[in-house]
Swiss-Prot record:
It comes from the Bacteria. It comes from Prochlorococcus marinus (strain NATL1A). Belongs to the RuvA family. It is found in: Cytoplasm. Keywords: Cytoplasm, DNA damage, DNA recombination, DNA repair, DNA-binding. The RuvA-RuvB-RuvC complex processes Holliday junction (HJ) DNA during genetic recombination and DNA repair, while the RuvA-RuvB complex plays an important role in the rescue of blocked DNA replication forks via replication fork reversal (RFR). RuvA specifically binds to HJ cruciform DNA, conferring on it an open structure. The RuvB hexamer acts as an ATP-dependent pump, pulling dsDNA into and through the RuvAB complex. HJ branch migration allows RuvC to scan DNA until it finds its consensus sequence, where it cleaves and resolves the cruciform DNA. Residues 1-67 are annotated as: Domain I. This is Holliday junction branch migration complex subunit RuvA. Has three domains with a flexible linker between the domains II and III and assumes an 'L' shape. Domain III is highly mobile and contacts RuvB. Residues 68-146 are annotated as: Domain II. Homotetramer. Forms an RuvA(8)-RuvB(12)-Holliday junction (HJ) complex. HJ DNA is sandwiched between 2 RuvA tetramers; dsDNA enters through RuvA and exits via RuvB. An RuvB hexamer assembles on each DNA strand where it exits the tetramer. Each RuvB hexamer is contacted by two RuvA subunits (via domain III) on 2 adjacent RuvB subunits; this complex drives branch migration. In the full resolvosome a probable DNA-RuvA(4)-RuvB(12)-RuvC(2) complex forms which resolves the HJ. The lineage of its organism: Bacteria, Bacillati, Cyanobacteriota, Cyanophyceae, Synechococcales. The keyword DNA-binding applies. Residues 156-224 are annotated as: Domain III. GO terms for cellular component: cytoplasm; Holliday junction resolvase complex.
Amino acid sequence: MISWLKGEKVHTWKISSRKGVVLNVGGVGYEIQLLPKQIDKAEVLNEFELWIHQIDREDGTSLYGFIEVNQRDLFREIISVNGIGPQIGMAMLEEFEVPQLVNAIENKESNLLTKTQGIGKRIAERLIVELRNKLQRFTDNDKTIHENKKGIEANQFSKYIDEIYLILNSLGYVDNEIKESIKIITINEKENSLLLNSSSAEEKAELMDKHLKEILMKLSEKTT
């Protein structure tokens, strides 16, 4: 049973609504389905470390990859529920962050769960009945969901900075140049973090475009 893989990306793929990556691990290519929201990172990274869930069937083996181990472990809990297959499990983790999904299940918020495509009210209620007393470990011991939400917000800002770093690096800028120029964003971390967490995907893209223009202008000034 494969539990974890580290390797070099060969290419990314898309089949219908499913997206993933092929990893070269010791000369063997592993085809792994990812959460769609992880594909942007897959496009720019050459090396991956993924937590894996493996499903074996008569017609072949499927691998599902997750950047964080708690995503993989919650995925396993979700697909243990009768009537929920791996594609619905992936859709739920695409729709929600782990603490948000755990919170919805523990608080019996079936209407929130039905936001996920493929989840009707009956399946949402079954998910709640079967899992609501099994997810304590995902709340990080004694931490509250509210504290976890703060962690998510900080993590979102960190991922946002990572994305900008990768874009600048792909444009040929070196580490020291990038770290210095990114300070114009990190100096206002609290303000920018709040903006990110209250913005739609389109607004986040506009914010990133604005920040990249500011950074590139600053970098061009240094080279003149």
